[in-house]
A protein has these predicted regions:
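Short, positively charged low-complexity motifs
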Residues: 1-4, 10-22
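Compositionally biased, intrinsically disordered low-complexity segments enriched
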Residues: 6-7, 28
């Protein structure tokens, strides 16, 4: 057996579980923690780094720049948020962008993928108390205001 995390080895040998059923829930917990810490750093106007994700707050402009693997994926200010794909339309990039949208945009706004293409879901208003959204092609530099 190859080297694996002790808990996974235990579950394979004792309980018969396979690593593939365990890795995704564990990964999603880690991702949510990183994204929560990322959002907290932006709220507190602080520099922060964990793993492949970093936040740098520029006090002069009042903008927090979020990077994934060193590539800029977002600029967050008090008034708006600009998103980028950083050159990689990956699951992780999309996850980070959606965590930012969940925190700093209107509920329901975000980035999604359909047939290998990225799209942005943008709030445009409310009709009879119901939120209305439009879907637009994703472009690096898209601004949520």
């Amino acid at each position: 057996m190859t080297a694996q995390h002790p808990k996974i080895v235990y579950l394979i040998e004792v309980e018969g579980a396979t690593p593939s059923t365990l890795s995704k829930p564990l990964l999603s917990i880690i991702m949510r923690k990183i994204e929560s810490q990322m959002n907290a750093a932006i709220h507190s106007n602080k520099d922060w780094k964990s793993g492949n994700t970093s936040v740098h707050f520029d006090a002069e402009s009042g903008v927090s720049v979020v990077r994934l693997h060193g590539n800029k994926i977002a600029e967050v200010s008090d008034n708006d948020m600009t998103i980028f794909d950083g050159g990689w339309q990956s699951v992780t990039t999309k996850s980070r962008l959606n965590a930012l949208c969940d925190e700093f945009c209107v509920t329901g706004e975000g980035v999604f993928q359909k047939d290998f293409a990225w799209y942005v879901r943008k709030f445009v208003g409310a009709i009879n108390g119901k939120s209305t959204f439009v879907t637009e092609d994703f472009e690096s530099g898209y601004i949520f205001a």
